[in-house]
Amino acid sequence: FIRNFTHKIVQSGLFVLFFAELWERFCYYGMRALLAVYVAEQFTQGDRSAASGMYGAFTALVYALGFFGGTIADKYLGYRRAIIVGGVLMAAGEFMLMIPTEEMFLMGLAVLIVGNGLFKPNISTLVGKLYKQGDARRDGGFTIFYMGINLGAFLAPIACRWVAGVMGTGGKPDYRWGFIAAGIGMLLGVVTFWRGFAALGDKGLPPKGREGMSSILVVLFGGLALAPAVYMLLAKAELAGYVTLALLIGILLYLIGYGLKSDKVTFQRILALIILLIGNIAFWASFEQAGNSLNFFARDQVKWESTDNFPLGGTRGELKAADAQSVTLPVGFARALDGAKASAVNITVTYPSPENVNIKVDATAELAS
């Protein structure tokens, strides 16, 4: 069964897209895990508000440019070439983040944003192109594809932060090496995708009349020409907010206009898409706190001490509160304790000294029936 299942994945090209997207998400989430904290420490003299503004502008522009990347692939490049060009630009942007000047850092982010706009929407579309409408394997294919996304996003913060810690000096991480690790991951994704062209068959080829290299060069240089405009928006985070809002309104009007000109079924699908987009705004605004406010909270309130270089704090990792000698952790799920069913558990850890650690467990419990 496993051999037949794997054979179908490889033959369909899903294997190639799985690993290409895994490495692209490794690149993005590895960089994102370090971005806000690095900006605060390197460029804003510890000002979280300014660092958060730049982070917000970055994420807003990442999502906004995906719309244009998909349009360019449809009309000019085709999905394959858009993915390759986007991946190369993302890797180049990551490597530019290594340069410790604010100007080059912002330009690196701008190049990365343009590259992500070409890569991200088109590889997801290419997964859909692998299956005909109504194919029973379609849902399973997207499930496997999203497993690659989640795996890359899970591994990236651990690996990139570990590299930054290993390459740092004086107990302080050098986040620039984390960006390098993310860029190398992106290059691995590009190579994986390029080497797997044969498994994709005729999927993702450029439109007729656009097969030459001229389309690639136009988009590549056009993307590089767009980077300075993105740079300006990153440098002026408040302006980026207004521009992103204008883009959102423009995209919504475009979709509505396109739907009104189309048949009834297409219009209904576009209307459903718009409703989902409204919900998505609230979700992603909350989700992106993982790379922003939650990152600062983890940095300031949690400290890992280790005797070795193991990524998660070593075999003797000691979790300490930053400004206290005790921490209470509420656990909001049922847990069996000595025959009782606990509805809430408070775990208090006190450590007057590293050699004297006390753990006290208080539980609100009911007798198990």
Where does each model-flagged region fall?
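C-terminal ends and interior cores of transmembrane alpha-helices
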Residues: E41, V85-L106
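Hydrophobic core of transmembrane alpha-helices in multi-pass small-molecule transporters
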Residues: L22, G93, M104-N122, L273-I281
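Central cavity-lining transmembrane alpha-helices of secondary-active solute carriers
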Residues: Y55-K75, K120, L151-A156, I184-L187, ...
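Helix-loop boundary and gating motifs at the non-cytosolic
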Residues: K8-T59, I275, W284-F297
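A membrane-interface helix-boundary motif in multi-pass transporters
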Residues: D47, W162-I184, V230-V243
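Cytoplasmic membrane-interface "Motif A"-like loop-to-helix N-cap segments
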Residues: K75-G87, G134-D135, T266-F267
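Disordered extramembrane loops and terminal tails of multipass alpha-helical membrane proteins
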Residues: F1-K8, G108, S124, G196-S369
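Intracellular juxtamembrane helix-capping segments at the cytosolic ends
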Residues: L118-Q133, G291
